[in-house]
Each structure stands twice: as C-alpha cells, then as structure tokens.
Regions:
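Serine-dependent protease modules
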Residues: 1-171
C-alpha cells in the first residue's frame, strides 16, 4: 500500500533587513508500506520528504491519519524509514492496507508498462501510468551518482517516496 506523508517543520528565513525569523512550513510526499513487526508498520520514503520534520503524519487510503516516527535515514541515497505504532490503527485501516510486494528491477525491460502511485501535489493518492523509458540512467545530485529507472509516467511534487509498480503490482 502507498500512503501520504505530511511533514511539519520550522524553517529559519533570513530577513531582508537582517536577522532571521522562524516560519512553520508543511510539505507532503508519499511512502510505501514495506514491513510490519509486532508493534509497528514500517514505511519507506525519501529522506527529503521527512528531513527537518518536527511532526510527521501518515495518511492511509481510508483517510485515517496518525503520527509517525523516523526509524532511520540515508541522506546519500535519499532514503528513510518511518514507523507507525500499530495500536494507533483501527481494524478498518489495517484491513484496507497491506505490505508491498517487492519485485526485481533487474527484470524490467524498456517498454514495459508501469504505474506510479503517490500523493501528487498533496491532494491524496493519485495514479499515473506509463512505460519504462530507460534503465540504469546515471544521475548525479549533490556529488552522489545513482543509477535510476526512467519512466514517462507523470511524477509530480508530492509523489516523492511513492511507488513505481510493474503490471504484477510489484514495487
């Protein structure tokens, strides 16, 4: 399952007249339920979705929203894992979600149809479709190079951390 993630933090902004002011800011992104243990639901997202957060809220497909805690981050790979306490979730929410099925990106081929699911523009879950345009695209950001999948499925602000699925529903 894909979830919406909201991040509330405080940003310090330089004033035009000198000095600084603090402003509360909110951003949104997406996450993918990748695991569950006895007490927590584990959600993978991008590090930049949760970086600098004072409060992280996860919203599920049934519109239930709960606070989440950061379990770990890897800024160089732009990855993060957040956790939601299972005791905060109703039986209805638990029955509406499931852990994502993981595929193997080495099995993808150019031209294969894919679906992108995320929290586009912070409006809640959206789905776009497209094709794998290229594999192993080398992209360098902040002196870190990654090998990525290129797709023509629309990816909008808020989709960060969301899922790119093959037609078998595998991540």
């Amino acid at each position: 399952s894909v979830v919406a993630i909201s991040n509330v933090g405080v940003q310090e902004i330089q004033s035009f007249f000198g000095g600084t002011r603090e402003y509360q800011s909110e951003s949104s992104g997406s996450g993918i339920i990748v695991g569950q243990n006895d007490s927590e639901l584990l959600i993978a997202t991008n590090n930049h979705v949760v970086s600098g957060a004072d409060t992280i809220t996860v919203s599920f497909i049934d519109e239930a929203s709960v606070e989440a805690q950061i379990k770990g981050t890897d800024a160089n790979n732009d990855l993060a894992v957040v956790a939601v306490d299972l005791s905060q979730l109703s039986e209805d929410t638990l029955s509406a979600i499931k852990v994502a099925s993981l595929g193997n990106s080495d099995d993808l081929v150019v031209g294969e149809q894919v679906v992108a699911i995320g929290n586009a523009l912070g409006y809640g879950q959206s789905v776009t479709s497209g094709y794998v345009s290229a594999l192993n695209r080398e992209v360098t950001v902040d002196n870190v190079t990654a090998s990525l999948i290129q797709t023509d499925a629309a990816i909008n602000p808020g989709n960060s951390g969301g899922a790119l699925l093959n037609m078998q529903g595998e991540l």
